[in-house]
Amino acid sequence: MDARFTAEQEEIRRTLRELLLKRCGPEDLRAAVLTPAGYDPALWEALARQLGLPGLALPEVYGGVGCSVTELALACEESGRSLAPSPLLATAVLGAPLVLALGAEAQRAELLPRLASGELTAALAVPGAVLATALGLVGDNGGDWAGGGRAGGVQARQVDGVWRLYGQAAQVLDGHSAGLLVVAAHTGGFARSRTLLYLVRDGSAGLVRVRQTSLDETRPQARIELRDVEAELLGDEDADVAGALAGVGDMAAAVLAAEAVGAADRALERTVEYVRQREQFGRAIGSFQAVKHRLADVYVEVQAARSAAYYAAWAAGTDAATATATATGTGTGGERVGGLALAQALEALRRAAGEGIQLHGGIGFTWEHDAHLYFKRAAGDESLFGPVHRLRGYAAEVARLFDRKGDGSRAEVTV
């Protein structure tokens, strides 16, 4: 891994930071989350048309920019700094990569250019509030999670050659406003059951979408009800859905880690700015050793999380771009570290946001102050994509850290 950024990568960061400083300040953010869509359409158009963010990591042949996961992670790190509400995560990180990975050529040619331009937004609908499981981050994504068990789920069946979906999914990121839903559904009955992905278009008969109240208002979520809705199978029935979801999940975890690092970094910056100005006992409270040590610990944690996020993005991008990475020795050999990076980044964000609230004193606990927005982002993301101990536990399980040899000793593991 080359830790140096190219001039193009630095330009992406600089341009996006300048735009978000102008267009997504605290007042803009609070106004955007109150709109029906949950984000500012004008800002989304600027991100899509001027900067090409939705298509940043999509191939040029489908209207994308042709960059790697690293560029997408850097862009999301900047959006995380401002907590910018937008369909970028749902569209560019979850929806479009699945269409690219599993879609038939006709589906790719129709949908990816529209997704890359920002004209069309997408959302991944997973039943049972098990998004992290479906993405292979905290458990077996080859299991029967789409069926939902007693909690319901989404069932798919063919009627006269047409796929129809029944069921519901909750906590769907941007599900209330997306023009395209990628729905995970259970099909084939219990003897031959499997999970496939289906495309549901906006305005389909029987589709009911309701925006839910969420802990983090900058991450709008929805409940999706499918009442005999006509759907289109994504790809074919032999598609490796579990493998595609796990691949997208690792990439998404790396990007989310970078976004969390951006939020943590900005929360720390704001706190440092405040303790330099706030005076007590005739001097700035930032001059007190106890305050310095707390902020120094946060700084170390944020920088460590940043390194982990960058490495995870590089690893995900290398494996996605080079099919022969293992054979040539130029890639990571199929190494998936996104979940570990996300766990470290979420911890750093939670620590930075929590210390920010405490060191701001009474004002940090008020609704009018922005400190709670960062804490809600940390808690909301951990609820959706974690929790942290499960991210680490599953990574240890995959790496076989707890396996023993025949003599009872631990298996040798390369980390």
Language model features with spans:
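FAD-binding glycine-rich core of flavoenzymes that anchor FAD
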Residues: 102-122
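A short core secondary-structure module
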Residues: 125, 168-207
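Flexible, small-/acidic-enriched active-site or ligand-binding loops
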Residues: 135-143, 171-174, 201-236
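Intrinsically disordered, low-complexity terminal tails and inter-domain linkers enriched
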Residues: 128-160, 188-189, 318-333, 405-411
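Alpha-helical interface subdomain recognition
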Residues: 1-80, 114, 118, 250-415
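A generic local secondary-structure boundary/capping motif
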Residues: 111-113, 135-145, 153-155, 169-173, ...
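N-terminal glycine-rich flavin-associated loop
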Residues: 86-106
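A generic structural signal for well-ordered coil/turn residues at beta-strand boundaries
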Residues: 120, 150-152, 159, 177-179, ...
